[in-house]
């Protein structure tokens, strides 16, 4: 059996990416960046905005991420646990 650490950050961003949910990212300097999450890793979030403009945002500069609609992490977490128990 494999033990995995629950990482809400990754669940949230991955769900927003897969479901193509628009997000507004508020940076610590007050700037807002709006768009779709195209990818992320431990250090950055790649956002595609209007007119396919790409923004690479360092996570240490992020204050808040607000999704355009509710992201249900409960079902995602249950699915991951079910897959890990097989």
UniProtKB/Swiss-Prot annotation:
An example of a Pfam family matching this protein is Hfq
Keyword RNA-binding applies: yes
A GO cellular-component term linked to this record: cytosol
Q: Name one GO molecular function term.
A: RNA binding
Q: Ranges for the Sm domain?
A: 10-71
Q: Which UniProt keywords apply?
A: RNA-binding, Stress response
State which residue ranges cross the membrane.
none
Matching Gene3D superfamilies, A to Z? 2.30.30.100
GO-annotated biological processes: regulation of DNA-templated transcription; regulation of RNA stability; regulation of translation, ncRNA-mediated
Q: Is this entry keyworded RNA-binding?
A: yes
The UniProt family comment states: Belongs to the Hfq family.
The record describes the protein's role as:
RNA chaperone that binds small regulatory RNA (sRNAs) and mRNAs to facilitate mRNA translational regulation in response to envelope stress, environmental stress and changes in metabolite concentrations. Also binds with high specificity to tRNAs.
Q: What is annotated about its quaternary structure and interactions?
A: Homohexamer.
Alphabetical list of NCBIfam families matching this protein: Hfq, PRK00395.1
Name of the molecule in the record: RNA-binding protein Hfq
Gene that codes for this? Answer: hfq
């Amino acid at each position: 059996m494999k033990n995995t650490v629950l990482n809400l950050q990754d669940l949230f961003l991955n769900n927003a990416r897969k479901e193509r949910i628009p997000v507004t990212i508020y940076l610590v300097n007050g700037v807002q960046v709006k768009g779709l999450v195209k990818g992320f890793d431990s250090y950055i979030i790649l956002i595609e905005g209007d007119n396919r403009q790409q923004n690479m945002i360092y996570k240490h500069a992020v204050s808040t991420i607000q999704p355009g609609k509710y992201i249900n992490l409960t079902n995602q977490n249950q699915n991951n646990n079910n897959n890990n128990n097989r």
